[in-house]
């Protein structure tokens, strides 16, 4: 009998074990689609980014013009740019939903997978930040100035560190060139980390909505979840293309249509929408170092979630108190996102401070307490 090439070929069997014959729980819902959607986002961003890089010039005198040239003179350049810019938004929508799914269903108890995932989030944020600087518009320049300047809050080495990162005494040509180099490099780091993420995931297998072991009831990934994933791809890509064609600048900042000018500060410096929740936390603390620490903590707190899990049940499916807290946290993050987009004045300052406080309180204090209380109520 001839050997089955798919199962015996050194390379094909790796693909087979990851995408075809992978045993998957029979009851995973649409919330488990976001991993593969993130994969599609990554591929889309790398392809469109490569095409953009072919026409882009990383020089302060030419960057803005090269982007304008792309949109005017390159065949479908406007489409490639709009897909790349809005693809970043979809990437973050998917990753936030993916993390939310992980928090709700207790997926963070696969500790290695979760920790690599948090590192992936940090790398994605770094990539998006350096990428936003490249068009060299007003918000690109001032965003880069404000955010890199935060490193100067680090005691003793801060100022030296910032000047080393800038390659001078302000954001200028060396900064732009190195940011372009980093923006080109980091997506490939993300690809590598994604493979590590999947390797750890396939050691334990997927979690499921009930949060119970599903070894007794597995189905092959292909055809069941390949078809399900393709439906997700079609929905997401149709939304992305619709946004890129009908409202390409909806999520952008109008300031970025003005070339960077170090002598004119925009009235409201703010990052892209997907960083606003963290930006609101940063602004809520009236001290530079404190703000930077809170900003870092807002993401790094995810590393602590596996350690803070006190419930005897893995998932929140049967834990109503934790569910209430979870959806309160979601609302809280949305409030932070909104506050981050508002100017720093009376009602927004206090709202931001309260939302920042409740963000950390829910994750660090209320989640473990509610879980312990539920154990008691359920006599577990």
UniProtKB/Swiss-Prot annotation:
GO biological process, one term: mitochondrial electron transport, ubiquinol to cytochrome c
Domain of life: Eukaryota
Single GO MF descriptor: metal ion binding
Record keywords, A-Z: Electron transport, Heme, Iron, Membrane, Metal-binding, Mitochondrion, Mitochondrion inner membrane, Respiratory chain, Transmembrane, Transmembrane helix, Transport, Ubiquinone
Pfam families tied to this protein: Cytochrom_B_C, Cytochrome_B
Keyword RNA-binding (UniProt): no
Family matches, as Gene3D superfamilies: Cytochrome Bc1 Complex, Chain C
Membrane-spanning parts: 34-54, 78-99, 114-134, 179-199, 227-247, 289-309, 321-341, 348-368
Cofactor dependence: heme b
Annotated residues for binding of heme b b562: 84, 183
Residues annotated to bind heme b b566: 98, 197
UniProt keyword annotation of rRNA-binding present: no
Bilayer disposition of the protein: Multi-pass membrane protein
Subcellular location: Mitochondrion inner membrane
Residues at which a ubiquinone binds: 202
Subunit structure: The cytochrome bc1 complex contains 11 subunits: 3 respiratory subunits (MT-CYB, CYC1 and UQCRFS1), 2 core proteins (UQCRC1 and UQCRC2) and 6 low-molecular weight proteins (UQCRH/QCR6, UQCRB/QCR7, UQCRQ/QCR8, UQCR10/QCR9, UQCR11/QCR10 and a cleavage product of UQCRFS1). This cytochrome bc1 complex then forms a dimer.
PANTHER family for the chain: CYTOCHROME B
Family, per entry: Belongs to the cytochrome b family.
Any further remark recorded for this protein: Heme 1 (or BL or b562) is low-potential and absorbs at about 562 nm, and heme 2 (or BH or b566) is high-potential and absorbs at about 566 nm.
Name of this protein: Cytochrome b
Gene from which the chain derives: MT-CYB
């Amino acid at each position: 009998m001839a050997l089955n090439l798919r199962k015996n070929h050194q390379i094909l069997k790796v693909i087979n074990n990851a995408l075809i014959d992978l045993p998957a729980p029979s009851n995973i819902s649409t919330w488990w689609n976001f991993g593969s959607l993130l994969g599609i986002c990554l591929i889309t961003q790398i392809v469109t980014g490569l095409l953009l890089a072919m026409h882009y010039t990383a020089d302060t005198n030419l960057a803005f013009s090269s982007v304008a040239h792309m949109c005017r003179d390159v065949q479908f350049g406007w489409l490639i740019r709009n897909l790349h810019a809005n693809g970043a938004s979809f990437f973050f929508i998917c990753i936030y939903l993916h993390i939310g799914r992980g928090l709700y269903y207790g997926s963070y108890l696969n500790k290695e997978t979760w920790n690599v995932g948090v590192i992936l989030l940090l790398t994605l944020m770094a990539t998006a930040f350096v990428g936003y600087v490249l068009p060299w518009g007003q918000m690109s320049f001032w965003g880069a100035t404000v955010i890199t300047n935060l490193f100067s809050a680090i005691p003793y080495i801060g100022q030296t560190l910032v000047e080393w990162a800038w390659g001078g005494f302000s954001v200028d040509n060396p900064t732009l060139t190195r940011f372009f180099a980093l923006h080109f490099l980091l997506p490939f780091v993300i690809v590598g980390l994604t493979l590590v993420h999947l390797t750890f995931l396939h050691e334990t297998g997927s979690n499921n909505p009930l949060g119970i072991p599903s070894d007794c009831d597995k189905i092959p990934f292909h055809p069941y979840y390949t078809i399900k994933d393709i439906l997700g791809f079609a929905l997401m890509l149709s939304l992305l293309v619709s946004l890129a064609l009908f409202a390409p600048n909806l999520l952008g900042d109008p300031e970025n249509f003005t070339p960077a000018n170090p002598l004119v500060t925009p009235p409201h410096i703010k990052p892209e929408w997907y960083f606003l929740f963290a930006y609101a936390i940063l602004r809520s603390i009236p001290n530079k170092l404190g703000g930077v620490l809170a900003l870092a903590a807002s993401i790094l707190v995810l590393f602590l979630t596996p350690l803070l899990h006190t419930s005897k049940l893995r998932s929140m499916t049967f834990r109503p108190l934790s569910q209430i807290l979870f959806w309160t946290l979601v609302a809280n993050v949305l409030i932070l996102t909104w506050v981050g987009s508002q100017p720093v004045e009376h009602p927004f300052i206090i709202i931001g401070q309260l939302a920042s406080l409740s963000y950390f309180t829910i994750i660090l204090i209320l989640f473990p307490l509610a879980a312990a209380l539920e154990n008691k109520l359920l006599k577990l």
